[in-house]
Amino acid sequence: MAEVASQETEFAAFAFGSVVERRDELEGRPWISYPVRVVADTPELVAVYLSHGTLLTFGDGPFSWGPHPWGPFGDRWQSAGILQLHRPGRGHSVWVLRDADTGAFREWYVNVEAPWRRTPTGFSTLDHEIDLVVPADSRTLRWKDVEKFEERARIGHFSPEEATAIRTEAADVAREIAAGEQWWDTSWSRWEPPAGWHALLQSFETEGS
């Protein structure tokens, strides 16, 4: 079963520019892990940056959910660099997606997932399948992968209580976006990484923490 975990705060905040691990943890093991750089780490906001070309490390199977879906695309992040925003305690993160050719802001991508759990090496979460896509300069959103989520719920990958909490989280953030009351500052769409924040190629220990 997946866990809808609460944010833990027993570890100190990470400094700007620190390289930390961002992982999806399934059944007590990393399903996918990759290094990111810290942009902000406060009680109200955690922001990390995933650079183009960064190494992706996939957990050793088998997993009840099967291999991580990014696996067929290789062990490097091939899209443009992504800023990921998370409000501690919320069950989603917001990814700032840019055009791979021009670098222009393209859309907000709301990734519904377990609230980030702080670890000694970074942050742990688990994707909950549902996504919301919000094009630049628009409050019109598109729901994505709802059918995949409902299938996981049907076959028991989420308990009934977990499934209800996930649906509620997705609906809540959708309402906030429609009302123009999203929690994140839209000026993050203009944020640029410092020069030199190139691909990260280190991996982290695969032991749970």
Swiss-Prot record:
It catalyses: cytidine 5'-({hydroxy[(S)-2-hydroxypropyl]phosphonoyl}phosphate) + H2O = (S)-2-hydroxypropylphosphonate + CMP + H(+). The keyword Metal-binding applies. Keywords: Antibiotic biosynthesis, Cobalt, Hydrolase, Manganese, Metal-binding. Its EC number is 3.6.1.-. Hydrolysis of (S)-HPP-CMP is inhibited by CDP. Its cofactor is Mn(2+); Co(2+). The keyword S-adenosyl-L-methionine does not apply. Involved in fosfomycin biosynthesis. Catalyzes the hydrolysis of cytidylyl (S)-2-hydroxypropylphosphonate ((S)-HPP-CMP) to give (S)-2-hydroxypropylphosphonate ((S)-HPP) and CMP. Can also hydrolyze (R)-HPP-CMP and cytidylyl 2-hydroxyethylphosphonate (HEP-CMP), which is a biosynthetic intermediate before C-methylation, but the catalytic efficiency is much higher with (S)-HPP-CMP. Belongs to the FomD family. This is Cytidylyl-2-hydroxypropylphosphonate hydrolase. It comes from Streptomyces wedmorensis.
